[in-house]
Swiss-Prot record:
This is TATA box-binding protein-associated factor RNA polymerase I subunit D. Its main location: nucleus. Residues 1-19 have a biased composition (Polar residues). It comes from Bos taurus (Bovine). The keyword Iron-sulfur does not apply. The modification Phosphoserine is found at residues 20, 132, 229.
Length: 274
């Protein structure tokens, strides 16, 4: 209600100023001076008091009745107001750059081709213990990779060992067993079992089993001690297969010669008989 009264008072003040200007100018049809319109103050926190009404409805309501009270605020009206206030983002138009689309022509460049020999020599990892094998030649990439992986593996294994030793010391201190740290090495302590000092669950042997074991000792056995010479294999080894094949080849050659001779002799006899 206060805002409506303020707007009506501003409109009446503007009309009185216009009338005074017209009377001073006389019967002139044109206005020589523009009346400065006072700037309207922004209404803050109007959402809580009034419902936002679009321009078309405002014109109809102001023409019909100015004494109508505003409607109560609802959630639907709030959402509609914020939807109308959302600014539409401008769509970015495609600007052609002139570059070719897709993969560029030519051979694909690799990182190895970009590295120079000087950079490779400066940054190459050194393994001096391999000079006896390769000499002063540079190592291939595969060997460098395998040795680097081995170095990293050894480093992480050493870290694991240090971590184990640290936690072992702390646990022994909590158990008040600090003397064992001085006597035993940590590597030997690592593979130590719980039943070193004594069995966890001792098993008692029965009397029947003890009697059977004593009887077996007194009984005679058929086992005899034998010298080692009985277990030595004879020195006669079979001939190799290659020799067998050679003998077969020689035999086939001899048979072929005999067959040729017999065939020739048969032909010679037949010619004479004819």
């Amino acid at each position: 209600m206060d805002s409506l009264n303020y707007t009506t008072a501003c409109d009446s003040a503007v009309e009185t100023e216009n009338q005074s200007d017209n009377s001073s100018s006389g019967s002139s049809l044109f206005k020589t001076q523009c009346v400065p319109v006072p700037p309207k103050r922004r209404q803050r926190n109007t959402i809580r008091k009034f419902v936002h009404i679009p321009k078309n409805t405002q014109a109809t309501e102001s023409s019909s009745d100015s004494s109508i009270e505003p409607r109560p605020l609802t959630l639907k009206a709030i959402f509609e107001r914020f939807k109308n206030k959302k600014r539409k983002r401008k769509k970015k138009k495609y600007k052609p750059t002139g570059r070719s689309v897709g993969r560029p022509k030519g051979r694909r460049t690799t990182r190895y081709s970009q590295i120079t020999e000087k950079q490779f020599k400066d940054k190459r990892p050194g393994f001096p213990f391999l000079e006896s094998e390769n000499g002063r030649k540079p190592l291939p990439w595969r060997k460098i990779l395998t040795f680097e992986q081995a170095v990293a593996r050894g480093f992480f294994n050493y870290l694991e060992k240090l971590k184990y030793e640290y936690y072992l010391k702390e646990s022994l201190k909590q158990m008040n067993v600090a003397e064992d740290l001085e006597k035993d090495d940590l590597d030997s302590r690592r593979y130590r079992y719980l039943d070193d000092d004594g069995s966890l669950s001792p098993i008692e042997e029965s009397a029947a089993e003890e009697e059977t074991a004593a009887n077996l000792e007194h009984d005679e056995c058929d086992i005899k001690l034998v010298e080692n010479s009985y277990f030595i294999i004879s020195s006669e080894f079979p001939k190799k297969k290659q020799n067998v094949h050679l003998d077969q080849e020689e035999y086939t050659e001899e048979t072929a010669l005999l067959k040729k001779r017999t065939s020739k002799s048969k032909h010679w006899i037949e010619d004479k008989m004819a």
